[in-house]
């Protein structure tokens, strides 16, 4: 379903990004792996980038070929990192890379953003999310102070804003057939799972008890691959939960179902 396509995967050095790069490659795609860290066994061509740095992103965009058929925005920082860094990488840098790269993408390309179950409460943060629409790298520190975004809250906010941005761009590039969707994993057994447990404490332990098991990167990658493929051409601006039923569990609790 991806035979002959060129797919750019950020965060390809580990976890869900590495699993996605390997999977789409196995389906015949030419992969360009992107990360700040050098993968032990890179899939396809590797390019290094710091998504917290505008100039680094500019260099990446210049180095990437024209005509790519897909962009999987999977790179991200966990909630234990400084709030400013989390927002720069998970939101501002991701958005900047995407908008700069769109002119070089092939018509009919697919963009898939890795959001999170942590972004479920975006509606309660709507004012701050809307205020972040044009947030630039040099404005992140002041924005965090103004909106009280500190500690682990930065991760939740970055994913809330990413889900909203995905929905807002449901038709932005429709004239070229370029679509955008998001995937929201629940807890996944990756190198940063311990960071979530450290941040959420008892809440994380309770979620683990509710779930039969944490997810695996191999649970998430096939959904990303599907959204990158032509089989998902009629899916636009959608956030797909891949969380073992946790999203439905939360909704049932909220609505007494």
Label the model's feature ranges:
Residues 236-257:
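Short C-terminal tail/terminal secondary-structure segment
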Residues 41-55:
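Rossmann-fold cofactor-recognition segment
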Residues 120, 184-195, 248:
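Short, flexible catalytic-loop segment of classical short-chain dehydrogenase/reductase
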Residues 96, 154-155, 160-163, 182, ...:
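C-terminal helical subdomain
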Residues 6, 13-14:
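Conserved glycine-rich cofactor-binding loop
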Residues 174, 179, 235-237:
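Short, small/polar-rich loop/turn modules that mediate ligand/substrate recognition or access, typified
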Residues 78-79, 84, 107-175, 187-188:
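Catalytic loop of short-chain dehydrogenase/reductase
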């Amino acid at each position: 379903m991806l035979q002959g396509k060129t797919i750019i995967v950020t965060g390809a050095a580990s976890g869900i990004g590495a699993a996605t790069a390997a999977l789409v490659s196995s389906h015949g795609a030419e992969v360009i792996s992107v990360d700040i860290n050098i993968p032990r066994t890179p899939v396809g061509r590797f390019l290094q980038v710091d998504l917290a740095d505008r100039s680094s992103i500019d260099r990446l965009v210049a180095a990437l070929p024209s005509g790519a058929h897909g962009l999987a925005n999977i790179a991200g920082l966990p909630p234990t990192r400084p709030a400013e860094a989390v927002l720069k990488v998970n939101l501002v840098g991701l958005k900047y890379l995407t908008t700069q790269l769109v002119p070089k993408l092939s018509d009919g390309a697919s963009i898939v953003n890795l959001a999170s179950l942590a972004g479920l409460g975006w509606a309660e943060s709507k004012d701050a999310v809307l205020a972040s629409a044009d947030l630039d790298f040099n404005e992140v520190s002041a924005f965090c102070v103004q909106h009280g975004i500190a500690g682990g809250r930065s991760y939740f906010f970055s994913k809330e804003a990413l889900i909203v941005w995905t929905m807002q761009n449901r038709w932005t590039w429709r004239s070229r057939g370029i679509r955008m969707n998001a995937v929201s994993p629940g807890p996944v057994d990756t190198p940063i799972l311990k960071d979530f447990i450290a941040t959420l404490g008892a809440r994380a332990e309770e979620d683990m008890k509710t779930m039969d098991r944490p997810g695996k990167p191999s649970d998430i990658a096939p959904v990303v691959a599907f959204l990158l493929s032509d089989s998902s051409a009629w899916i636009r601006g959608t956030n797909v939960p891949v969380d073992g039923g946790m999203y439905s569990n939360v909704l049932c609790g909220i609505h007494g179902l």
